[in-house]
Amino acid sequence: MSCFLGPSTNNKSRENEGSSMAAPYEQQNLPRNDRRQITTWEAVGTNKESPKNIKAKSFKFRELATATNSFRQEFLIGEGGFGRVYKGKMEKTGQVVAVKQLDRNGLQGNREFLVEIFRLSLLHHPNLANLIGYCLDGDQRLLVHEFMPLGSLEDHLLDVVVGQQPLDWNSRIRIALGAAKGLEYLHEKANPPVIYRDFKSSNILLNVDFDAKLSDFGLAKLGSVGDTQNVSSRVVGTYGYCAPEYHKTGQLTVKSDVYSFGVVLLELITGKRVIDTTRPCHEQNLVTWAQPIFREPNRFPELADPLLQGEFPEKSLNQAVAIAAMCLQEEPIVRPLISDVVTALSFMSTETGSPSGLTGTALNPLSPKTVEDQGWLQCESPRDVYSLL
């Protein structure tokens, strides 16, 4: 279950859920117009990680214990690879918050923890869950985040209960766009840049307006950014969402996140969980099931969530499937950059007619073109869309 959630339909810990970790964005993957020197987070934190230099508020443990009624079970709203998350209400301000109590096994030292808090406190974007504060008290390590009353995308898409209103098509595209913008910030605008590493539907939180906010980014020590590739000592992502090259070799790049985004977009299109052993054998892995359909564009409508009851523009469905198919390509080099995905989804979410006025890059990582030049978003039929993949 994701962190910082509102009431969830399923609070039990999920199998195969790895720690939600972030890693540095390799220098070789910086945008062509931004080959700036980047440093490790540890270097960024040097001489700055003292509490007085951290923008996030420092809380006493007793304050957070009071806010959560001593971390009672009824206040528990989520569990993940890093610990438990409780809903709380600050006694002094009345602010409702989400308190993440980190697992005390393998605790970092005080300095390492403060370096990470300093790093997290520098990340600000409308599509990231805000870090309000932290607690470093004895062996206790806690993070305080804004509370997200609607829970996670998973709650509204994959754990729909009887009588619950399913997400409509426009909301799904809007959520996809918000999540993509959050990733774009981490990849291309944060300094130093960050790879999410465990992007999934349970880590996409929703506020009262159904705006997407990413959670659980950057909660682990980061490796060297000088290497040509970031090779993790162990793969820690969630099965089904991990890019194949990361799962096989531990090699991590921004394109690993793009693959994971493609999985979530496919979940948004289909309403199906990426791994579900209750489905027929050939459908248990969502990506494996969808790949043959990607090759037969006339079958694209088969991917649509039955709960949508056909209430979606066919052209928009075709475009969304095209984006997902590109993100889910086996070879990382031919996947798009997340900024190209943002361009495409922005166009989809605002389209009112002819797309000829759109400027920017199209979804083609090998030979960037304008949307007008490549034309893939202008296609009317599934076959036309797929011919441009």
From Swiss-Prot:
GO terms for molecular function: ATP binding; protein serine kinase activity; protein serine/threonine kinase activity. The modification Phosphothreonine is found at T238. Residues 1-36 are annotated as: Disordered. The modification Phosphotyrosine is found at Y246. Keywords: ATP-binding, Cell membrane, Kinase, Lipoprotein, Membrane, Nucleotide-binding, Palmitate, Phosphoprotein, Plant defense, Serine/threonine-protein kinase, Transferase. It is a lipid-anchor. The active site is at D198. It is found in: Cell membrane. ATP binds at I77, G78, E79, G80, G81, F82, G83, R84, V85, K100. The modification Phosphoserine is found at S202, S232. SUPFAM superfamilies: Protein kinase-like (PK-like) (SSF56112). Its EC number is 2.7.11.1. A lipid is attached at C3 (S-palmitoyl cysteine). GO terms for cellular component: plasma membrane. It comes from the Eukaryota. It catalyses: L-seryl-[protein] + ATP = O-phospho-L-seryl-[protein] + ADP + H(+); L-threonyl-[protein] + ATP = O-phospho-L-threonyl-[protein] + ADP + H(+). Residues 71-348 form the Protein kinase domain. One of its GO terms (biological process) is defense response. PANTHER family: OS07G0668900 PROTEIN (PTHR47985), SERINE_THREONINE-PROTEIN KINASE PBL24-RELATED (PTHR47985:SF34). Belongs to the protein kinase superfamily. Ser/Thr protein kinase family. May be involved in plant defense signaling. This is Probable serine/threonine-protein kinase PBL24.
